Amino acid sequence: MFAIETREVPTQTVLTEQRVVFAHELQAFIDDAMGRLLATADSLGGVTGPAFFIYHDEITDENSGPMEICLPIDPARAEETDAPTRVEAGHREAYTRIPKRLVEYPQILAAYQAVEGWIAENDTEMIDSPREVYFADFMAAGPDELVCDIAFPILPVEAV
């Protein structure tokens, strides 16, 4: 059901906001943080790539975990803000593209499991936390429109 592909992701400077949340708190955190981050990015010339959300641990209704929202900006402008920024190192990713209707918990878990399975079957390793990469206008998209990549940073297959 899920087609898995790989890609190279360049090094990016990102605005970032992190919080430890439960699954039922995710949407409120995303809405609040994205408002702040987008306003800051606009003051720095705008975003330079898709927003991505990094899940540094499993987040469920019973277990909280750290979640990070990242918004790429022009690295030359990063010093102009007091908002937290960092450099996200370039890497290779295995990913699958999903429609808006699957970007809900627990439905989204099947996409994560598909990418994890591909990683195991292809003898590579995850080297950083999984992420959701939002490349389309989520609010304007219909339920069957592709809006998000479920992505895992991996070692290049030949490096394993």
Predicted regions and their residues:
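A solvent-exposed interaction/effector surface
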Residues: 1-160
